[in-house]
């Protein structure tokens, strides 16, 4: 196949889609490029074998190569390893809008691989990868009801930005990624700075409109390639069997869905499913048990959906707008820095906040460069939370995705590092789950942080919305259950403060979501969020004024940049000595910000005192309590500050020159001295304030001699190591 190229004007960028030159043995391969960022996306699918599957085995792998930015991977193994969290999140970003566009009952294996080959740091590769995946699917011959487009939308000074650069993203109040077909929005992922529902809805509509030009070009590319799609037909539905299942099981299934307790309801439905399969196989042993089970599931779906559309109570007895009962316990765990047990219906999370110092920040080394993450949120979904057994270990894609959503919801309200210099780690342990565990994590995180004394700008709550739609009839549901998510048409999660939205995630399984439906969903989400915030405020309205007794303390100091060398010392000796003597962790950056970190408040104060002494300057006219550090023939060196000595001349010590200094002073003795002067070379002249009066008179009568060392004496002292060198200071 000859090379085919499409160029698309996409905001301020030119998007190029190419096929026919690279990876020609894949079913579909597209090189997608934008301003120096190039992503190769390939699609391969099995033409048979789907009959043996009872699910759709779609795999999306997004991978970043370090050579794309001219870097060699760090660490011992100099090659790319397991996917980073960012790669996992972008894989999910590609997967979510395309998965609903494959036909029902299409179970053939499909694999999509998106590889970043070249990166312009100012152009994010995620949108390019999503568009490339859509184009590769469209030319692969796989049954796919696309193409889709994708766009990133920012918001600054009242204006929406299409595909903003990295620099523009930093100044934007919104980071929204949207994907959809030319007729419908399918997926939204966003982080916002407390924006209103109207602004968020406007951003979605703007992004959807802007991506239509991309969709049109992908359709043209597919026509130019001209690959015919195989005739694929879904298995014919056995209407006779479907009617028979309805006759045998409907009444019992309807009764089962009146059971409000999830585990009891599931147990009863499992019994009914097995009874139905056994009864029908007894009537006709040629029937397939899996087919019967699938049709039984369709019956469940029909019953739940029709009840809701008819205005009947939901599975747990609620109306469409009611939030499940909420209970909250802060300070749930005794020895943690902050904790919360958040329960909403049959969804429950233990959320724990831990405070650390700058060394605890997560180092992220990706192709975009190294950075440090001061706020980590880890979401765990153990199998016991849904009454199942399963593997426990590394987080799965879903756990990484849910944790990222909850983290985004809190980013807008975190205090500035200068105001609260702690590194924060949140762990959310989902202990029960029946829908919306990520939003329970958002609420629990807000409460756990405030319980730990973190001064959030405002509390944050989240709620998951659902949709049931048949033709022109629809119902928007607040705070959906797991069954309502599974059997419904939309999962729409909204988090925010009383002021506005901080995070939004939407996945839609059908086309035809109107502006009216979206507006109602946002309005109900605001109502639900406001209710939840009220319950949260009753439990803990503001952050605690005192940190937990188990939490470490951080003190931050600012020193002059020319004092950094003094604190560190030669070869790091001074700062190491401070750390060893006080037990305090000490960090200092190039701008002179010193961070002291310790669970011991007294140790923290001592370290701060010693650092202040280290950088203090000796002042003329001031009195110091000094210690005799060395006695010489012509006087005594008195240590005034760490690393800083002054000379108390023999004339200030002895009554006459026949008396020895050792007869009056001993090394280690503490005396009060007065700084009489400092010469141009930095040498300090001292006077002894409290020496006996008789000695004072004799000194006054004594001939005035050089109070400072002669040049010969000074050289001798420096050479013999008796005076502190500048490096040691």
From Swiss-Prot:
User: What Gene Ontology terms for biological process does this UniProt record contain?
Assistant: mRNA catabolic process; RNA processing
Task: List required co-factors.
Answer: Mg(2+)
Residue ranges annotated for the KH domain, each copy included: 552-611
Q: Which PROSITE patterns match?
A: KH_TYPE_1, S1
Question: So which domain of life are we looking at?
Answer: Bacteria
Enzyme class, first EC level, given as a word: transferase
What positions does the domain S1 motif occupy?
Answer: 621-689
Q: Which subcellular locations apply to this protein?
A: Cytoplasm
Q: What SMART domains does the annotation carry? A: KH, S1
Looking up CDD domains in the UniProt record yields:
KH-I_PNPase (cd02393), RNase_PH_PNPase_1 (cd11363), RNase_PH_PNPase_2 (cd11364), S1_PNPase (cd04472)
Any one GO MF annotation of this record: RNA binding
Pfam families from the entry?
KH_1, PNPase, RNase_PH, RNase_PH_C, S1
Quote the catalytic activity from the record. RNA(n+1) + phosphate = RNA(n) + a ribonucleoside 5'-diphosphate
Q: What's any one GO cellular component for it? A: cytosol
* Entry keyword set: Cytoplasm, Magnesium, Metal-binding, Nucleotidyltransferase, RNA-binding, Transferase
Self-association state and partner proteins as the record states: Component of the RNA degradosome, which is a multiprotein complex involved in RNA processing and mRNA degradation.
Q: Which NCBIfam families match?
A: polynuc_phos, PRK11824.1
Stated family = Belongs to the polyribonucleotide nucleotidyltransferase family.
Instruction: State what this protein does.
Output: Involved in mRNA degradation. Catalyzes the phosphorolysis of single-stranded polyribonucleotides processively in the 3'- to 5'-direction.
Q: What is this protein called?
A: Polyribonucleotide nucleotidyltransferase
List the source organism: Legionella pneumophila subsp. pneumophila (strain Philadelphia 1 / ATCC 33152 / DSM 7513)
Q: What gene is it encoded by?
A: pnp
